[in-house]
């Protein structure tokens, strides 16, 4: 085991503090509408230019092990805030730096760090409650667009596209961000249920120009198992042929004799039929087949329910107004399922989302929910170069997360004003002792820091701006984009309350833990070994001195 280096007291805190400052100073230049970009070297490809706090934080690794510990702790603040709220990473980093910086001074002066932490915790609870009291719900598409615009660095195009996407797919809908092939940023909305499985044979195509298969008013068969034998399918095919309607077969797979027979019947015109593989794998596939069956008003054919394919009748099949299938995707539009069945299924999926602890499972459940109730919107981000594309895509994802948070918990005045407005509640807290009071005062001072930094990045004196905002009436604040003091909610300078709350809670949590650190342990760097002397020279080559 490698030997360790141990630092105590002020020495440990000084090293950690240096690491915190190095990371926070790199991140905080991006804060606010006039924040600057950071360029990051990559080991492959062109450098990345970004204004996203968490992207900057993730790139920072410091040479000194103790400084790096401080930096990694603040990186945790940014990452956690990004994971939960999706935005507000720079604000969280600025708050963490301010809380730790103020706290270190007090601990060095002999204050009790544990009591300071208690004071910080009390202050955060009070401020969080006050933020809830000044929160306004997002009322319309315009406010959603404003949140997106602010988060996307005042890009109104991005804000408007996100608001439009949310209006079309609803709160439960899935909105994804992809790279566009052109320069324009566009929105593509898929109505109905779409899954990533295409036709099993190109012979099923009904529109050779577009290479798609379009079925109007088809029956839909959902089968859990692989279909290989024609004998199993014959009864249901005969029933569908009698009513002269198209048929979509969704199964684990259709192959061999069964697939060949379907293709021959399609080519002869005896039956308009298409076979596609079921989406997903394992238990998730089963759940998605059940979703499709409920959406279309049919019954999924599962062996464990005692239903066999050869016994299926038309009443077990689902129907939809239209189905479009291409090489890679199937879209079912306007399924004929009963609304009460769909609502019950939605309720069940929501309960599973609440219960699951896996982020991956939650994401997949939300996708299923969106396909049942809302729809799927895809924002295609366009740019002239790959570097600009990456930077713009980061901003779109931030803005999307911010708007979701705004819809979820409402909005507060932006630009750091909500924090300054909340300072007054700290006067009502009764601290147990002077050390707890010191903890309250740390939060009192730190809550001004985001506004100071936004003002500084815009070229204004932070202290003067903070004083003016504090004296102004409720709702009024500093608009760094225009340099005006105005009603920020009317001006559209708004932040999601969830982002503001999570940023403060995470910053206080990590910074107060760092304050209570009395000892830091890291691996000793291995001493560099001197390079050995090179081997002997080129002896035995005498007699060449006459050569020029």
UniProtKB/Swiss-Prot annotation:
Superkingdom, natural source: Bacteria
Gene3D superfamilies, per the entry: GroEL (3.50.7.10), GroEL-like equatorial domain (1.10.560.10), TCP-1-like chaperonin intermediate domain (3.30.260.10)
Any one Gene Ontology molecular-function term assigned to this protein's record: ATP binding
GO cellular component: cytoplasm
InterPro entries listed in its UniProt record: Chaperonin_Cpn60_CS, Cpn60/GroEL, Cpn60/GroEL/TCP-1, GroEL-like_apical_dom_sf, GROEL-like_equatorial_sf, TCP-1-like_intermed_sf
SUPFAM superfamilies, sorted: GroEL apical domain-like, GroEL equatorial domain-like, GroEL-intermediate domain like
Protein name: Chaperonin GroEL
Gene this protein is translated from: groEL
């Amino acid at each position: 085991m490698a030997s360790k280096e141990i630092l105590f007291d002020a020495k440990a805190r000084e090293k950690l503090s240096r690491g915190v400052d190095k990371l926070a100073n790199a991140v905080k230049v991006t804060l606010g509408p006039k924040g600057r970009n950071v360029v990051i070297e990559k080991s492959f490809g062109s450098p990345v230019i970004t204004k996203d706090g968490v992207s900057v934080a993730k790139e920072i690794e410091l040479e000194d092990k103790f400084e790096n510990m401080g930096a990694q702790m603040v990186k945790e603040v940014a990452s956690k805030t990004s994971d939960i709220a999706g935005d507000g990473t720079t604000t969280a980093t600025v708050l963490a730096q301010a809380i730790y910086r103020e706290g270190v001074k007090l601990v060095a002066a002999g204050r009790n760090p544990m009591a300071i932490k208690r004071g910080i915790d009390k202050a955060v609870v009070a401020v969080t409650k006050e933020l809830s009291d000044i929160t306004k719900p997002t009322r319309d598409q315009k406010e959603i667009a404003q949140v997106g615009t602010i988060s996307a660095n005042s890009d109104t195009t991005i804000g408007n596209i996100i608001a439009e996407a949310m209006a079309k797919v609803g709160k439960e809908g899935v909105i994804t961000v992809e790279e566009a092939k052109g320069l324009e940023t566009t929105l593509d909305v898929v109505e109905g249920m779409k899954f990533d499985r295409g036709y099993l044979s190109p012979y099923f195509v009904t529109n050779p120009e577009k290479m798609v298969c379009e079925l109007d008013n088809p029956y839909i068969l959902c089968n859990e198992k692989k279909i290989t034998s024609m004998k199993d399918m014959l009864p249901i095919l005969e029933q569908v042929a009698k009513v002269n309607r198209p048929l979509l077969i969704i199964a684990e797979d259709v192959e061999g004799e069964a697939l060949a027979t379907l293709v021959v019947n399609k080519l002869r015109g005896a039956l308009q039929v298409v076979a596609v593989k079921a989406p997903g794998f394992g238990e998730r596939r089963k759940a998605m087949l059940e979703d499709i069956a409920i959406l279309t008003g049919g019954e999924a054919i599962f062996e464990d329910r005692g239903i066999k394919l050869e016994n299926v009748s038309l009443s077990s099949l689902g129907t939809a107004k239209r189905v479009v299938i291409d090489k890679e995707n199937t879209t079912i539009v306007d399924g004929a399922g009963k609304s009460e069945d769909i609502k019950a299924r939605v309720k069940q999926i929501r309960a599973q989302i609440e219960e699951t602890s896996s982020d991956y499972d939650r994401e997949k459940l939300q996708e299923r929910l969106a396909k049942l109730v809302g729809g799927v919107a895809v924002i295609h981000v366009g740019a002239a170069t790959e570097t600009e594309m990456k930077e713009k895509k980061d901003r779109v994802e931030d803005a999307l997360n911010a708007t979701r948070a705004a819809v979820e918990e409402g909005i507060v005045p932006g630009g750091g004003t909500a924090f300054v407005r909340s300072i007054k509640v700290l006067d009502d807290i009764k601290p147990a002792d002077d050390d707890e009071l010191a903890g309250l005062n740390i939060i009192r001072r730190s809550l001004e820091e985001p506004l100071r930094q936004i003002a500084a990045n815009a070229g204004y004196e932070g202290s003067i701006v903070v004083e003016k905002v504090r004296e102004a009436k409720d709702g009024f604040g500093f608009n760094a984009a225009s340099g005006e003091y105005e009603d920020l909610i009317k001006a559209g300078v708004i932040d999601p309350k969830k982002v503001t709350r999570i940023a403060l809670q995470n910053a206080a949590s990590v910074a107060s833990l760092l304050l209570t650190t009395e000892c830091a342990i890291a691996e000793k760097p291995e001493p560099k070994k001197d390079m050995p002397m090179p081997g002997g020279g080129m002896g035995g080559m005498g007699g060449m001195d006459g050569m020029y």
